[in-house]
Curated annotation (Swiss-Prot):
Protein's GO biological process: photosynthesis
Membrane topology, as annotated: Peripheral membrane protein
Main function: Light-harvesting photosynthetic bile pigment-protein from the phycobiliprotein complex (phycobilisome, PBS). Phycocyanin is the major phycobiliprotein in the PBS rod.
Keyword Membrane belongs to the record: yes
Family (UniProt): Belongs to the phycobiliprotein family.
Main localization of the protein described in the UniProt heading: membrane
Source lineage: Bacteria, Bacillati, Cyanobacteriota, Cyanophyceae, Nostocales
Record's protein name: C-phycocyanin alpha subunit
Compartments, as annotated in UniProt: Cellular thylakoid membrane
Keywords for the protein's UniProt record, in alphabetical order: Antenna complex, Bile pigment, Chromophore, Electron transport, Membrane, Photosynthesis, Phycobilisome, Thylakoid, Transport
Transmembrane segments: none
Length: 16
């Protein structure tokens, strides 16, 4: 299960 924190990091990392 992904945590909201992990989701935020992944989203920011995708944006570069």
């Amino acid at each position: 299960v992904k945590t909201p924190i992990t989701e935020a990091i992944a989203a920011a990392d995708t944006q570069g």
